[in-house]
Swiss-Prot record:
Alphabetized Pfam families for the sequence: Beta-Casp, IntS9_C, Lactamase_B_6
Gene this chain is encoded by: ints9
Any one GO cellular component localisation term in the record: nucleus
Gene source species: Xenopus laevis
CDD domains to which the protein is assigned, alphabetical: Int9-like_MBL-fold
Motif window: Nuclear localization signal: 566-570
Cellular location(s): Nucleus; Cytoplasm
Family that this chain belongs to: Belongs to the metallo-beta-lactamase superfamily. RNA-metabolizing metallo-beta-lactamase-like family. INTS9 subfamily.
Chain intervals for the UniProt region annotation (Disordered): 547-586
Any Gene Ontology biological process: RNA polymerase II transcription initiation surveillance
Phylogenetic placement of the source organism: Eukaryota, Metazoa, Chordata, Craniata, Vertebrata
Protein task: Component of the integrator complex, a multiprotein complex that terminates RNA polymerase II (Pol II) transcription in the promoter-proximal region of genes.
Additional free-text comment from the UniProt record: Although strongly related to RNA-specific endonuclease proteins, it lacks the HXHXDH motif that binds zinc and participates in the catalytic center. Its function as endonuclease is therefore unsure.
Assembly, per entry: Component of the Integrator complex, composed of core subunits INTS1, INTS2, INTS3, INTS4, INTS5, INTS6, INTS7, INTS8, INTS9/RC74, INTS10, INTS11/CPSF3L, INTS12, INTS13, INTS14 and INTS15. The core complex associates with protein phosphatase 2A subunits PPP2CA and PPP2R1A, to form the Integrator-PP2A (INTAC) complex. INTS9 is part of the RNA endonuclease subcomplex, composed of INTS4, INTS9, INTS11 and inositol hexakisphosphate (InsP6).
Keyword line: Cytoplasm, Nucleus
Name of the molecule in the record: Integrator complex subunit 9
């Protein structure tokens, strides 16, 4: 069993498991941190960005100034943003049989995999994962395509050039594998390959293994996966949460008794309490509004935004914010808000009950009805007419490199009355803000990450007790900035196996058994022999027939009698007779009783010697040794076949035949 690691990002995994002649891809996350190396894509012409000076090397070389721009001491690529793909050279991706998706954040690289590698298999995911994943991809494509960039920078990627660049460009990994965004045509083609599944639904793969999605408690439709055969079980835990938010709670019971547990997608902010962060978010928002400023919340169009809107629904009246408009701007804003209300069966129990009252599961429906929350596809048209300040704007993208958020950063960045509040934990807020410096607006970092922390993981592993744990190397050591915090790493016994990008792990687990069916007519011919109370054995002479990964024992073919002929056949043409089977032996030989038997049969001067594997009986007079081991017996005597046979018969008296 082998695990191929194709991604270096622990919360955006992409691994391939080779298990019983099947090749299974576990997620295909897209690392978007690469876009932080690029300049933002403004919706309207930005004089500030267009006047940034080109980067010049220390020796005055200005050949890169068209591709690289400098802003407040940082160097950025002036080109269409590119994304860091999973490894494509480590294994032939056209050999992948199936792709299992755990949540909508972990499927953003799907079009690259399914449309550009020769992949012909099937993708499995839950319906909310597919629908919300579609929205995220659609939004991403829209953000990139609506601001076309004339030039495409490539010179800076050459190794001899990259090493001259300042950090972080100098340290960027696998820059030649970075790719521009896919098209909507590729998105639709990729999604057409997905087969929808429900929680606890068992899916057979080629008769080899069975895969089952389980609720992971993190997002709408998010799943952990159990991959098992008749005698082996692998659990894949990715992006899970034990907190009570809007999704169904995590199914932990089904993860028990795993031979291998692959663990990814833990919280990226292990020291931050999500409830505390939500409280901070609300108080900073209220403080800014009261002082006459605007609040900008860079966010994804699904996920944490539902919980933030629910908290604000309960908070705005008590905080005196009932007259403040809330704007949600995204090309998919309307679809996202509607989807959240119709996926009732994927919600936690309390929200499911509201559907039958009937009430909307999420309170943002009431915010929309009361005109406190308004949603728009973009900043043009209706939004321009309705726009009032001070206000709160939820919009994307959290990288601050593309989307409507770029416009608001340029619009509000010059005033210290305004505040940008970062709630998404996927990106460094300092790196996100770098191309907007110097910045007058206030910045607040309230990362809300409900995924498992290390304390919860340690408790979970003690409860489900897998034989082996496999995880990214980042989880086996404390963070570099907090090297003294040994509690910020996975603690389990035996210690977890770790992996990094482009590594192949041989998992410490060997297949020991295989299920085989036996034909009824063959079963009838068996004669069991009782070895001890409750245990019987029988010898089987059969033909093993394997097809479609099913194994069947069939009776051996009977020799075909040759057709009658007067012509005498040569001996070579006659059907060979099957030699009789030698009986199988079982049991153990009590050495002291065996020595007594030897003495009764005329052998004297017998000595016994203990060894690491058993005993040696030495017949000194006959110059013969008899070695007794757990699974074998050897009689060593030179040039006396009659003596050997005589001793063999004495040994056989102590063993059972069947």
């Amino acid at each position: 069993m082998k695990l191929y690691c194709l991604s270096g990002h622990p919360t955006l995994p992409c691994n391939i498991l080779k298990f019983k002649s099947s090749t299974i891809m576990l997620d295909c996350g897209l690392d978007m941190t690469s876009t932080l190396s690029f300049l933002p894509l403004p919706l309207v012409h930005s004089t500030r960005l267009s006047k940034l000076p080109g980067w010049v090397t220390k020796d005055g070389n200005n050949q890169f100034e068209k591709e690289l721009k400098e802003c407040s001491g940082r160097v950025f690529v002036d080109s269409v943003p590119e994304f860091c793909l999973p490894e494509t050279e480590l294994i032939d991706l056209s050999t992948v049989d199936v792709i299992l998706i755990s949540n909508y954040h972990c499927m953003m690289a799907l079009p690259y995999i399914t449309e550009r590698t020769g992949f012909t298999g099937t993708v499995y995911a839950t319906e909310p994962t597919v629908q919300i994943g579609r929205l995220l991809m659609e939004e991403l494509v829209n953000f990139i395509e609506r601001v076309p960039k004339a030039q495409s920078a490539t010179v800076w990627k050459h190794k001899d050039v990259q090493r001259l660049l300042p950090a972080p460009l100098k340290d960027a990994v696998e820059v030649f594998t970075w790719k521009k965004c896919y098209s909507m045509q590729e998105v639709n083609a990729a999604l057409s390959k997905i087969q929808l599944v429900g929680y606890s639904q068992k899916i057979e793969l080629f008769g080899v293994v069975q895969v089952t999605p389980l609720s992971s408690g993190y997002a709408l439709g998010s799943s952990n996966w159990v991959i098992q055969s008749h005698y082996e079980k692998v659990s894949y835990v990715s992006g899970s949460s034990l907190l009570t938010t809007h999704p169904q709670p995590m199914d932990q019971t089904s993860l028990k008794n795993s031979d291998v547990l692959i663990l990814t997608g833990l919280t990226q902010i292990p020291t931050a309490n999500p409830d505390g962060m939500v409280g901070e978010f609300c108080s900073n928002l209220a403080m800014t509004i009261r002082s006459g400023g605007n609040v900008l919340v860079p966010c994804y169009p699904s996920g944490v935004i539902y919980d933030l809107l629910e908290c604000l629904y309960q908070y705005i009246d008590s905080a005196g914010l009932s007259n403040v408009p809330f704007y949600f701007i995204s090309p998919v804003a309307n679809s996202s808000l509607e989807f959240s209300q119709i996926f009732a069966e994927w919600l936690c129990h309390n929200k499911q009950n509201k559907v039958y009252l009937p009430e909307p599961p999420f309170p943002h429906a009431e915010l929309i009805q009361s005109n406190k929350l308004k949603h728009y596809p973009n900043i043009h048209g209706d939004f321009s007419n309705d726009f009032k300040q001070p206000c709160v704007v939820f919009t994307g993208h959290p990288t601050l490199r593309f989307g409507d958020v770029v416009h608001f950063m340029e619009l509000w960045g010059k005033s210290s009355l305004n505040t940008v509040i970062f709630t998404e934990p996927d990106f460094s807020y300092l790196d996100a803000l770098a191309p907007y410096q110097p910045l007058a607006m206030k910045c607040v970092y309230c990362p809300i990450d409900t995924r498992l922390n290390f304390i919860q993981v340690t408790k979970l592993l003690k409860e489900v007790q897998p034989l082996h744990v496999v995880c990214p190397e980042q989880y086996t050591q404390p963070p570099a900035t907090q090297s003294h915090r040994s509690d910020l790493m996975i603690d389990c016994q035996p210690p977890p196996m770790s992996y990094h990008r482009a590594e192949v792990l041989t998992l410490p687990f060997k297949r020991r058994y295989e299920k085989i069916e036996i034909m009824p007519e063959l079963a009838q011919s068996l004669v069991p022999f009782e070895m001890k109370p409750g245990v019987s054995l029988a010898t089987v002479s059969a033909v093993l027939h394997s097809k479609d990964n099913k194994h069947v024992l069939q009776p051996p073919p009977k020799p075909v009698a040759p057709p009658g002929s007067k012509k005498r056949k040569r001996p070579a043409e006659e059907s060979p007779e099957t030699p009789p089977f030698k009986p199988l032996l079982s049991g153990s030989i009590p050495v002291e009783q065996f020595v007594q038997t030897l003495e009764k049969n005329g052998f004297s001067d017998v000595k016994i010697e203990d060894t690491a594997k058993g005993h040696i009986v030495h017949l000194q007079e006959a110059e013969t040794l008899i070695q007794f081991e757990e699974d074998s017996t050897h009689i060593i005597c030179e040039h006396d076949e009659r003596l050997r046979v005589r001793l063999r018969d004495l040994v056989l008296k102590f063993l059972q035949k069947f």
